[in-house]
Amino acid sequence: MATKTDDFAPFPVKDQLPGVEFCVSSSPNWPEGIVLGFQHYIVMLGTTVIIPSILVPLMGGGDVEKAEVINTVLFVSGINTLLQSLFGSRLPVVMGASYAYLIPALYITFSYRFTYYLHPHLRFEETMRAIQGALIIASISHMIMGFFGLWRILVRFLSPLSAAPLVILTGVGLLAFAFPQLARCIEIGLPALIILIILSQYLPHLFKCKRSICEQFAVLFTIAIVWAYAEILTAAGAYDKRPDNTQLSCRTDRSGLISASPWVRIPYPLQWGRPSFHGSDAFAMMAATYVAIVETTGSFIAASRFGSATHIPPSVLSRGIGWQGIGVLLNGLFGTATGSTALVENTGLLGLTKVGSRRVVQISAGFMIFFSIFGKFGAVLASIPLPIFAALYCVLFAYVASAGLGLLQFCNLNSFRNKFILGFSIFIGLSVAQYFTEYLFISGRGPVHTRTSAFNVIMQVIFSSAATVGIMAAFLLDCTHSYGHASVRRDSGRHWWEKFRVYHTDTRTEEFYALPYNLNRFFPSF
C-alpha cells in the first residue's frame, strides 16, 4: 500500500491548545464545577501545610500557632485567588504559599536579635512581626514592577525560545518536593503515583469513561483510595515502632494539628501585633519577590496554554504581577510567614483535567476561605499524608514542564543557535540551583559569604531558583546571540507572538483577558 503524503506532514502550530474541555472563559455545570473546585483546594493543601510546618516550630510556635498560620495562609490564598482571577491576569491560577520566601524567612527567624526572647510564644510573635514587616516593604517593589509596567517592558522581549526554559524549569525546578518526599513513605507514595497514572491515563481508554470522569476526578479518587489505605496501615499499628520521621510522613492521625485547630476562627490583619521593619530583612525578602515574579510568569504562560487561551499579552501579565504584589501585601498584613505565588501543582492540574475554567478556580477560593474559618474541618483534610501530595506532584509538575516543551512548536529546532540556548539554559538552571541548595544544606550557609549577610541571602535566594537562573541565561542569550541575523527572529518564534505584544492587536485577547464589569474603560491594557 502506498504511503500517504499526510503521514509526513508536520503537525500544525496551534496558538490555542486543542482538546481542552473547558477553556478560560467557559464553565462546567455547577455540580461538576464544585467538585473540580474542591479538587483544586485539596491539591493546594500540600504546600499550604508544608511551609508553616517548616517555619512555625523554628519560630518558637507550637501546634496551636501552626494551625493558626495554616488557616491564615488558606484564608489569604482564597482572597488572592479571587483577586487574581477577577482583576489580575484573569487566568485560572491558584495563588498560594511560595517556597521562594523560605530562605529569607529562615534568615529572619535565625536572626541573633530573637535569641533574647526565652518564652517560645513571645519569640514566635516577634519573629512573625519581623517577617510581616519585610513582606509589606517587599510588596511595594512587587506592585511597582507590575502596575508601573516595568515587568511588561521586560516580557515583551520574551520569545517562545526563551520562555520555554522558564516554563520547563518552573515545573522541573520543584522536583525536590516530588519523588524525594514520596520516598519518605514509599508504601503510601508509590501506590498513589501508580493509581493516579492508571486512573488518569489508562482507564479512560480502557473503559471509555463518560465525559472524561476518570481524567477530571483522578486526583480525588487517588487521594480517597490511598488515604483509606494509609488509615488501615495506621490503625493496624504498622508504624507504632517506626522512627519518628517515618511516623510523621506516614501516619494519618496527626492529632496535634486537629486538636489545636479551633472550630471557628476568622483570621484578621495584624493578628500577631504591629509589624516591625528592618532594612536587611526587607532587602532579603525583595529578592524572594523577584523570584516569585519569575516563577509566577512561568505558571501564567502554562495556565494560558492549558486554558486554551491565546498567549498572555505583556500588559495583562504585568497586571497580574501587580495584583500578586497586593497579595504579598495581604500576606504581610495577615501574617502568613510567606508570600504568594501561582501554585505550580494547580497549574498542572489544569492540564491533567483538561479543565481550564476560571470559574472552577474561583469556586476553589471559596473552599479555601470556608475551611480557613472552620478550622477543624480543614485540619482533617490537612492530615492527608504528605507522600500522597508528593505523588500528585510527580505528575502535576511534569504537566507544567510539558507546557514549556509545547512552546518549542513555534521555534526552529534545526537551528544550532536554538539548540545551544535551549540546552544550556535548562542545564545551567538546574545545575546552579542544585549547587546552591546542596551547599546550603551541607555547610549551613550559601557559597556567597561576604560581610553583608543580607547580600548573601539575596544571592542564595536568586540562585537557588532553577527557573530564575534559567530565564536569565535564556533571555540574555536570545537577545544577544546572533540577534542581527535575518533568520533569528523566525527561528526563535518571535513572529508567532508578535500579534500578542499589544493588547488589542488580536481580537481573541478580549475574550480571555478583559476585566469584568467593563473596567477596561477605566484601566486599559496596552
UniProtKB/Swiss-Prot annotation:
Cellular component, GO annotation: membrane
InterPro entries tied to this protein: NCS2 (IPR006043)
Record keywords, A-Z: Membrane, Transmembrane, Transmembrane helix, Transport
Distribution of this protein across tissues and organs: Highly expressed in the root central cylinder. Expressed in the filaments and stigmatic papillae of pollinated flowers and developing siliques.
One Pfam family per UniProt: Xan_ur_permease
Keyword Membrane in annotation: yes
Record's keyword annotation contains Transferase: no
Localization in the cell: Membrane
One MF annotation (Gene Ontology) recorded for this entry: transmembrane transporter activity
Signal peptide positions on this chain: none
Protein topology in the membrane: Multi-pass membrane protein
Annotated transmembrane regions: 42-62, 69-89, 91-111, 131-151, 157-177, 186-206, 217-237, 282-302, 359-381, 388-410, 420-440, 457-477
Similarity annotation: Belongs to the nucleobase:cation symporter-2 (NCS2) (TC 2.A.40) family.
NCBIfam families, alphabetized: NCS2_1
Official protein name in the record: Nucleobase-ascorbate transporter 4
Organism: Arabidopsis thaliana (Mouse-ear cress)
Source taxonomy: Eukaryota, Viridiplantae, Streptophyta, Embryophyta, Tracheophyta
Gene: NAT4
